[in-house]
């Protein structure tokens, strides 16, 4: 029987991590864990409760009493915040523009990493985020780091938002993604960083299926070792 692997997929905002991770998880019959959705959920909770996003203690206290669940359904994974489906709401610009602010706090990241490690400890998981290969699953057998230009990522997010009927501005998206890159890369705790043993994939000129194929090939190579 093949050993169930842990697959860590990291990369900057809008690099296609979640889309690719879902495909890889489905092909491998693994559990998909969207860590970004967890940070988005606590960001939404903070906005709903009027918590100052720079107040680390207040955010930590809120997180400790907040239930965030990733629920598998026939329509894909849903995100529940205290038993309420917030799958769509966490993808709005209101949340997207603030999630990096919330995610920079040490106390928030420590609690999230603890929850994520608990979810991933049995293997057979595909987890995507900013610090999966470096902090959450440092022993993952397959580590991937996705790259794409800011312009390409803004284009993808623009098209994604248009399909959902959101009013979006391409130039504004470029600015927001560049700002998130800066926040994610420069934060003190678990910054966005490629793990030393991660395979780097530039997705700029690749389709989602091609990227997923490269990751599945990497997993196959590990399984054959």
UniProtKB/Swiss-Prot annotation:
Q: What is this protein called?
A: Cytidylate kinase
Q: Does the keyword Kinase apply?
A: yes
- What is the similarity comment for this entry? Belongs to the cytidylate kinase family. Type 1 subfamily.
Q: Which CDD domains match?
A: CMPK (cd02020)
Q: What is its EC number?
A: 2.7.4.25
Q: Does the keyword Transferase apply?
A: yes
Q: Which HAMAP family match?
A: Cytidyl_kinase_type1 (MF_00238)
Q: What catalytic activity is recorded?
A: CMP + ATP = CDP + ADP; dCMP + ATP = dCDP + ADP
